[in-house]
From Swiss-Prot:
GO terms for molecular function: rRNA binding; structural constituent of ribosome; tRNA binding. It comes from Rickettsia felis (strain ATCC VR-1525 / URRWXCal2). The gene is rpsM. It comes from the Bacteria. This is Small ribosomal subunit protein uS13. Belongs to the universal ribosomal protein uS13 family. Keywords: Ribonucleoprotein, Ribosomal protein, RNA-binding, rRNA-binding, tRNA-binding. Pfam families: Ribosomal_S13. NCBIfam families: uS13_bact. InterPro entries: Rbsml_uS13_C, Ribosomal_uS13, Ribosomal_uS13-like_H2TH, Ribosomal_uS13_bac-type, Ribosomal_uS13_CS. Part of the 30S ribosomal subunit. Forms a loose heterodimer with protein S19. Forms two bridges to the 50S subunit in the 70S ribosome. PANTHER family: 30S RIBOSOMAL PROTEIN S13/40S RIBOSOMAL PROTEIN S18, SMALL RIBOSOMAL SUBUNIT PROTEIN US13M. GO terms for biological process: translation. GO terms for cellular component: cytosol; small ribosomal subunit. Located at the top of the head of the 30S subunit, it contacts several helices of the 16S rRNA. In the 70S ribosome it contacts the 23S rRNA (bridge B1a) and protein L5 of the 50S subunit (bridge B1b), connecting the 2 subunits; these bridges are implicated in subunit movement. Contacts the tRNAs in the A and P-sites.
């Protein structure tokens, strides 16, 4: 397995698919990296030479924010929104959907497991 940006990428897959295993790289960005490195997208990772792997590493490290740096930036952005107490920050604090989704009938994933209201009984006449 080749190691790029501290991630083991699979050998038996095409280069474009393997690069998407790195957090922050999608299919379009992976294709762009292959073009910059002048490597065929259809080439398997196990067929790459050491020189090609080095060029891929250099391109990714110098031009793109991936893995730990990107995760850190995202968490800092969320923390900043929480600190200034803007609308999105408040939604993060309350663990509700941030981008305007409905919460009346959906949003179970974000809100967590449904909790029954204990002791609530219908009023008896």
């Amino acid at each position: 397995m080749a190691r790029i940006a501290s991630v083991n990428i699979p050998d038996n897959k095409r280069l474009v698919v393997s690069l998407t295993y790195i957090y922050g790289l999608g299919p379009a960005m992976a294709a762009e990296i292959c073009n910059k490195a002048k490597i065929s997208k259809d080439k398997k990772v196990k067929e790459l030479t050491d020189q090609e792997l080095i060029s891929l590493r250099n391109i990714i490290e110098s031009e793109y924010k991936v893995e730990g740096d990107l995760r850190r930036e995202v968490t800092l952005n969320i923390k900043k929104k929480k600190d200034i107490r803007c609308y999105q920050g408040l939604r993060h604090i309350r663990k509700l959907p941030v981008r305007g989704q409905n919460t009346h009938s959906n949003a179970r994933t974000r809100k967590g497991k449904a909790i029954a209201i204990a002791g609530k009984k219908k009023a008896v006449k």
